[in-house]
């Protein structure tokens, strides 16, 4: 568990660490100023889209060969695709490396599947909640650390550092992660169709996939306009610092709450915790649209993090309980696929809403998306759920 947590932390940090200066790096590669935003968006979305499309393939291989080999494969390849960004001569090569990075990604979903397969099911919420804090902490610390390191070391040196971090992650996984897994012959691998047939509820599973996508849409739709919204609320001095602080507030509260809420889900039922977290998230997004000061927005974002701390552990625990162990990696890979699609769609939805309707409309729209998802999950749980099957 500890090594998987560290691996998730390093993976989350390595991705988020380079985001603050990606646009500047693309500008330094000679891209015209009027195309910088386009190529920056493409560099981010290309990796997420590629990861989404190939995730089911890696999931099937993980169910046959084990999750640990897939974790090692992902971290070793990303050592070169992320570290190699330090040597790109132009934006075309950068985009190629970002594409390869997405194709060979998959450390986090395989680490999740490994813990889900080996942890006692009655304690899966706590185990997966604890694991989720690794990604949260890495994603939280990454941007702050990346900006400081780029200032003192230079952008290319930061890419080399990220490659080194991922190499350490690869070695930790290779030597210290333990998995009880026996190689399965190709003819004996359960087909994906049978995995879904033997799950306890395909309807609920599909709803959980969509919920993972909605979580990312809601997060990424707000991300492009958050600093602009903060300025709209009257913050003009130290705008980047204040924006980073408000983003970090969400991650900090999520980090504090994930393990406890995962344990709470094991006690009261993860379906109940998920519904509560979705309605709570809807309420906080709606209130963010009504914020009149930066302080109010910061407090609301901090409170929203407690909802985030319950969402993914609840989804992962429910998927674990609904899925036959022989196909658990594929189910988590499909969940990752939907999550990646959300990462791609979110910024476009948020930017379009802000352009045509204003900044507050982004929060109103996001709250309605989350509310719709809450109602769908409520319908699914009331219609298809047999509580005894997921305990």
Predicted regions and their residues:
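Central cavity-lining transmembrane alpha-helices of secondary-active solute carriers
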Residues: 42-58, 248-260
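Symmetry-related core transmembrane helices of the 12-TM Major Facilitator Superfamily/SLC fold
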Residues: 158-175, 363-379
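Cytoplasmic helix-loop-helix junction between adjacent transmembrane helices
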Residues: 97-135, 318
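Juxtamembrane intracellular "pre-TM" segments in multi-pass secondary transporters
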Residues: 1, 179-208, 391
